[in-house]
Amino acid sequence: ISFLITGDEEGYATNGTKKVVDYLKKKKEKINFCIVGEPTNPNKLGEMIKIGRRGSITGKLTVIGTQGHVAYPKRANNPSDVMVKILKKIKEIKLDRGTKNFQASNLEITKINIDNYADNVIPGFAHATFNIRFNNKHSSNSLKRKLNTIFKSISKKARCKFNINYQVSGEAFLTKPNKTTYMVQDTIKKITKIKPKLSTTGGTSDARFIRKIAPCLEFGLVGKSM
């Protein structure tokens, strides 16, 4: 039995579980099963086991226009207008309706920023950030292709340029329940008197690294206050 404690689980999470997994892969260590101690229970201990997670991709988009004076709009090209069209378009996309094991994929716009301190100046740049939580009907690469097609189409029509940077926190994954999963489920029920639901809801976790070397599930404390 091995026990791993990490202090680098949030954000980029580069110096914790990820490096341990890389080390174990190089050493060709075999792990039979892993339990990740995430706060999986919504309200009471014993309610939920996580057997998979949605993927997460963040996009930082910049639309590049031409700065100018608002009194002479024909001499400028307002990137704000283009950004609004792009954000409206990607927000309206219905990525899917969910699956048997996953809720529907969802895009949220998290930041909109225009660095313009003058009220009478058309800005040269417009910035926005968005995040998609996606199920296993998609990969980060398939979503990038879909989004980039939209960015190119709208920007080209507006005669603007754009830059996009993506950060992928993890791909969607599902651990098919096996006898170990059901053994843990039965044990939890015996102790808590609650049969835990097998779920894939919530954010990303270090299970996204562990699942590359071993089947895993997540079970831990109550996460009601998160």
Language model segments and positions:
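Short beta-strand/turn micro-motifs at beta-sheet edges
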Residues: 46-51, 115-121
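A short beta-alpha structural unit
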Residues: 107-115, 131, 135, 161-181, ...
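A structural signal for short, well-ordered beta-strand segments
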Residues: 3, 59-61, 109, 128-132
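Fold-level recognition of mixed alpha/beta catalytic cores in primary-metabolism enzymes, strongest
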Residues: 1-89
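Acidic-enriched catalytic cores of C-N bond-cleaving enzymes acting on peptides and small amides
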Residues: 70-113, 121, 136-162
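Hydrophobic/aromatic beta-strand patches that form the interior of the parallel beta-sheet core
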Residues: 4, 35, 158, 215-219
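Short, flexible turn/loop "capping" segments at secondary-structure junctions
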Residues: 63, 120-126
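Zn-dependent metallopeptidase/amidohydrolase metal-coordination segment
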Residues: 185-226
